[in-house]
């Protein structure tokens, strides 16, 4: 069958709906699109090279899981006909990678897809690419340094430097990055003098998108996290590690030695977005069991994103997991920065879209002698 249009007949596609739904046309027409995905490949290759040079072993863990663990998120559910049981598309590989530490592998990483049954936005796609890395006898501090090393190397590979421009604004990705405890950030950047002692009227004013019942259901850690998300996160343009997370929202992280109410945990924020999450890993099976039990209580109270009980993982910890540090780094959001992409759909070759009202079809039929390019009918905006 003859091609509908030749490569050189295109001079760009203005309709973003067609760009995302028919990426092959976008790649044919748009040099910038091809360059962006070449940059992505260069950056991902650099990521793997740096980790392997540091002695990390690349592994693969299950996509179909009996328990959707390792993160607070709503999973996709599928059914295994032969076994007559429901399974979950993984929301994170964390608990399997930690089992490998129990088994004796001291440095492991995986770059692969995670799946979360949540909304679509310029920053969210239901399936996305994530790096997770774990190192025995390391801690959260080591994972901060690893994060800086990886981002610095990937930026050099894709952009030939660490000082870039994102959406018309300067952005310096040169390590080391600033650090700021979460509570301090809420006080200093959020302008909330005493976030631990707020009345209902204050919370209603500061968290207007939550109902009275939702505000009442928040524990102290969730309340601080909600205040941070509403009043601090959008302001974090330059890279900053937010540290000292409340233990209530960190069920897989080790407690800080000098303050057991806090987790030895960090998240990296750039341009108002979370890019990385890491911590010193909890390896006490009794503490982990109690954390899972607390999360199960939260689920029974209506929190659909709370962690599930995973007794098999607790059993693995009872066999002995060494102290360790772990890191999760979102590849798509990082590639957005390196390619100056406004939407996550610009860095995923075939992003998920809302269904069109009718099947795509040629508007005028195949290209004729004039060389007119094939154009699909446009459905509703995603």
Each model region followed by its residue ranges:
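Class II aminoacyl-tRNA synthetase catalytic cores and aaRS-like
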Residues: 1-382
């Amino acid at each position: 069958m003859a091609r509908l249009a030749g490569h050189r007949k295109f001079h760009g596609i203005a309709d973003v709906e067609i760009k995302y739904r028919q990426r092959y046309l976008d790649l044919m027409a748009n040099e910038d699109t091809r360059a962006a995905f070449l940059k992505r490949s260069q950056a991902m290759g650099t990521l793997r090279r740096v980790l392997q040079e540091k002695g990390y072993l690349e592994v693969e863990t299950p996509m179909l899981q009996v328990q959707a663990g390792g993160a607070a998120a709503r999973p996709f559910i599928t059914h295994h006909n032969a076994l007559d049981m429901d399974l979950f598309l993984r929301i994170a590989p964390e608990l399997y990678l930690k089992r490998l530490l129990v088994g004796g592998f001291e440095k492991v990483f995986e770059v692969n897809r995670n799946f979360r049954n949540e909304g679509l936005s310029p920053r969210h796609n239901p399936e996305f690419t994530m790096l997770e890395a774990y190192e025995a006898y390391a801690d959260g501090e080591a994972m901060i340094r690893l994060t800086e090393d990886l981002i610095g190397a990937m930026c050099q590979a894709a952009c030939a430097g660490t000082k870039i421009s994102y959406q018309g604004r300067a952005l310096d990705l040169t390590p080391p990055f600033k650090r700021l405890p979460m509570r301090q950030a809420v006080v200093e950047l959020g302008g909330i003098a005493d976030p631990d002692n707020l009345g209902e009227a204050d919370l209603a004013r500061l968290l207007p998108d939550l109902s009275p019942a939702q505000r009442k259901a928040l524990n102290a850690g969730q309340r601080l996290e909600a205040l941070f998300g509403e009043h601090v996160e959008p302001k974090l343009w330059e890279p900053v590690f937010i540290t000292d997370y409340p233990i209530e929202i960190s069920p897989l992280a080790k407690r800080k030695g000098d303050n057991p109410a806090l987790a030895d945990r960090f998240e990296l924020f750039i341009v108002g977005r979370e890019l990385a999450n890491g911590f010193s890993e909890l390896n006490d099976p009794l503490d982990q069991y109690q954390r899972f039990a607390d999360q199960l209580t939260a689920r029974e109270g209506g929190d659909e994103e709370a962690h599930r009980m995973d007794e098999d993982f607790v059993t693995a910890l009872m066999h002995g997991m060494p102290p360790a540090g772990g890191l999760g780094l979102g590849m798509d959001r990082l590639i957005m920065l390196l390619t100056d992409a406004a939407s996550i759909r610009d860095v995923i070759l075939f992003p998920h879209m809302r269904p069109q009202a009718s099947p795509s079809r040629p508007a005028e039929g195949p290209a004729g002698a004039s060389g007119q390019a094939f154009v699909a009918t446009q459905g509703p905006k995603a």
